[in-house]
Amino acid sequence: MEEFQGYLELYRSQQHDFLYPLIFREYIYALAHDRGLNRSVLLDNVGYDKKSSLLIIKRLISRMYHQNHFIISVNDSNQNKFLGYNKNLYSQMISEGFAVIVEIPFSLRLVSSLEETEIVKSYNLRSIHSIFPFLEDKFPHLNYASDVLIPYPIHLEILVQTLRYYVKDPSSLHLLRLFLHEYYNWNTLITITPKKSIFAKSNQRLFLLLYNSYVCEYESILLFLRNQSNHLRLTSSGILFERIRFYEKIKYPVEEVFANDFPATLWFFKDPFIQYVRYQGKSILASKDTPLLMNKWKYYLVHFWQCHFYVWSQPGRIHRNQLSKHSFDFLGYLSSIRPNISVVRSQLLENSFLMDNAMKKLDTLFPIIPMIGSLAKVKFCNTSGHPISKSSWADSSDSDIIDRFVRIGGNLSHYYSGSSKKKSLYRIKYILRLSCVKTLARKHKSTVRTFLKRLGPKLLDEFFTEEEQIFSLLFPRTSSTLKRFYRGRIWYLDILCINDLVNHE
């Protein structure tokens, strides 16, 4: 009966957007813990103490409401114990539970949108590789592309204010403000690097929720501007940034100043060939029109971030390049538009002649130099690309060492299966293969030549991926099908995150 009562409370909260009572329900934190276990591939799960108590969570929340913020103690920052319990542990539990609760409106909106569009296999759209077929289809017809780095909010209050458009419960938002003020430096500039973040790994889900709501708000307005510029030709549209009256048609001149003292018009956005893709904090804005239009988009985005989100952004963070002459770095690939020339023989009566048919295609290359730099950082090779032994793994068992190297090589082969030229990828696999042999030889105090003679070709076969093994069994080495497999591009729909070696920025 208690289980049904919990589901009833969850259902009522979904219907009325009143999420605050769920914070004091123990099954919410059990759900957050289970989700952490299921998502251990994406986020590191630190687990929970067996002595965790919902009563301690309630006391922490009550303390946040009743404390005097005008009295600042020097030793407050060093106090990690609260009533004899680990304060950081319970702050992590509150953040995890709050993230699960606030995700409810977003999940309901996602389910309804998928039902309206009749998308059955929505999990395929979550794959990173699903972006590249879109790029192959759209980008060969475009001329210019701008690399856009989305700025981070300088104040956490901006994230909370953005979240209120989607969460209609003031009590939950007020608790979020108190929580961020209690456990994090309120005035800290948000900078995300692989090694340092104001949010610890244990609180990544809460940060991702806040940041994604900020990006969702930015993209919803950007999409609205793009759609209005394509369809409204006779009447200009004034952008009202209050979501209650999202937009309205106006009859005033186009020089009309919009809300927040933000002068802008939609007249220079009339380009039906604008395409936009994004992953994390980097996006690509491509167009078929002139460079003048791309420059207008560039300065519009800078002013838009400053006036609406109060985020300082410099024009230098947006780089405009011509697709036919420059490559753009996106999702670990170096992509560019290259002409694909095919010769066609035409026969007209007794005369025949050859014609060159040039078609543009997206070329995705493996970034060999940045990848060697990534391997050098983790001590698989030196900066010149020469393999070295992984000394920190020499104490492990032989099977563990081989499994680690095989797993890294398999992940890289799986992710870069869409590379147009795989010669550079084979060089990286060679570095990992020889680094594995040198690590094993160092462990057994032997030479590489002697160790290879002892193991034979079995060690090298471990580095073949599952797809390569299947194709090598089905087709002979000289068959054209096997050659097309090694040369062709393959996009997978099960890649949900980028490996640390791939993310070499």
Swiss-Prot record:
Keyword Plastid (UniProt): yes
InterPro entries assigned to the protein according to its UniProt record, in alphabetical order: Domain_X (IPR024937), Maturase_MatK (IPR002866), Maturase_MatK_N (IPR024942)
GO molecular function term, any single one: RNA binding
GO biological process, one term: tRNA processing
Cellular component terms per the entry's GO annotation: chloroplast
Keywords: Chloroplast, mRNA processing, Plastid, RNA-binding, tRNA processing
Principal cellular location given in the protein's record: plastid
Protein location: Plastid, Chloroplast
Classification via Pfam families: Intron_maturas2, MatK_N
Superkingdom in the source lineage: Eukaryota
HAMAP family: MatK
Family under the similarity heading: Belongs to the intron maturase 2 family. MatK subfamily.
Function of the protein: Usually encoded in the trnK tRNA gene intron. Probably assists in splicing its own and other chloroplast group II introns.
Name of protein: Maturase K
Native source species: Rosa stellata (Star rose)
